A protein has these predicted regions:
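Beta-rich carbohydrate-recognition and catalytic domains
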Residues: 69-72
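Conserved beta-propeller blade repeats
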Residues: 1-9, 40-59, 87-104, 132
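A flexible loop/linker signature enriched in serine peptidases of the S9 family
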Residues: 2, 9-19, 38-42, 60-67, ...
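Rossmann-like AdoMet/SAM-dependent catalytic core
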Residues: 84, 93-97, 106, 113-115, ...
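Multi-bladed beta-propeller domains
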Residues: 11, 23-43, 74-91, 118-132
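Structural beta-strand/beta-sheet cores of well-ordered domains, especially the beta-sheet scaffolds
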Residues: 4, 18, 31-33, 45, ...
Length: 132
């Protein structure tokens, strides 16, 4: 992870986080780079570091729908990549650990399930913990 930068969200006029920026420590805020912007006024955004500290995840969500993007912490010019396109009523959250990506979702699982895959580009998800 590059300790010269940090990421933050910026609030819109309704005090909702809708944009993610990257700031270089010691530089002017005027030079901050817009990394992600949520276009829907119903959705808010946040950014987090994966458990294995290899990826940043940008999550955008409303009350019952979510969508997530990712990029590697080593990327010099971060370009968030979509994990799974938003689908109304489907909530999901992806994290990475031990060489796998884990997805906690209610997609076809009212009480949620956890799936995993080893590659987000191919996304061959397998059930890790089934819904009850």
């Amino acid at each position: 992870m590059d300790d010269q930068y940090f990421f933050y969200s910026k609030l819109d006029e309704f005090h909702r986080p809708r944009k993610i920026f990257r700031h270089k420590i010691g530089s002017s805020v005027k030079n901050d780079e817009l990394i992600f912007e949520e276009k829907s006024e119903a959705f808010t955004v946040g950014i987090s570091l994966s458990s294995d500290e290899k990826y940043f995840f940008i999550t955008t969500s409303d009350h019952n729908t979510s969508e997530q993007y990712y990029f590697e912490v080593t990327e010099k010019n971060p370009k968030p990549k979509l994990i799974i396109k938003r689908n109304k009523g489907v909530i999901y959250s992806v994290n990475s650990w031990g060489g796998y990506f884990y997805c906690h979702t209610n997609d076809d699982a009212e009480d949620f399930k956890i799936e995993r895959c080893d590659d987000l580009l191919n996304q061959k998800w397998e059930i890790y913990i089934a819904a009850k």
